[in-house]
Amino acid sequence: MSQEQAEQLMQQMQMLETYFADLSQRENTFLGVFREATAAIESIKSLSKNPESDTLVPIGLGTYVPTKISSDSKIILNIGAGVAVEKDFPSAINYLEERIKEIEIAIQDTAAKKQDAAQRLEQGKAQVNQLMQAMQQSGQPPKSG
């Protein structure tokens, strides 16, 4: 393997490491959205059982206003692109469950891509180790870039 090929391999390894880190960040984002959607469903179910609940409404910078929830059948749901719609509890739960299915697919896809990237990283590390051994056996000192 030539010096140029070794440098290309190292660049590929760096790109793969960056890609793997990006996938990990995406996976964490998806997991956060998944937890949030699951918690929202549980909250809606709780509200349907106890409609006259006390709660805290955030008004910014860690400040909350105590209030009572008076609606036992409607909820405002952000559906994206700055659009919010009013839905009854079962419809809101159904919408959130559909979103959870989409998120689960995205998590699985991201996990598969991460596994592939990890495999390619391991192969690259093995190639680097072989290169280092070959260079040591030939008496050629490894050059750092």
Swiss-Prot record:
Biological process, per Gene Ontology? protein folding
Q: Which domain of life is it from?
A: Archaea
Q: Which SUPFAM superfamilies match?
A: Prefoldin
What would be one Gene Ontology cellular-component term for the protein?
prefoldin complex
Keyword Chaperone recorded: yes
**Cited Pfam families:** Prefoldin
Write out the entry's keywords from A to Z.
Chaperone, Cytoplasm
Molecular-function GO terms, alphabetical: unfolded protein binding
Has UniProt tagged this entry with the keyword Amino-acid biosynthesis? no
The UniProt entry, under InterPro entries, shows: PFD_alpha_archaea (IPR011599), Prefoldin (IPR009053), Prefoldin_subunit_alpha (IPR004127)
Q: Where in the cell is it found?
A: Cytoplasm
Where does it primarily localize?
A: cytoplasm
Family per record: Belongs to the prefoldin alpha subunit family.
Q: How does it assemble?
A: Heterohexamer of two alpha and four beta subunits.
- Please explain the role this protein plays, according to its UniProt record: Molecular chaperone capable of stabilizing a range of proteins. Seems to fulfill an ATP-independent, HSP70-like function in archaeal de novo protein folding.
Which PANTHER family does the UniProt entry name for this protein? PREFOLDIN SUBUNIT 5
Full protein name = Prefoldin subunit alpha
Q: Which gene encodes it?
A: pfdA
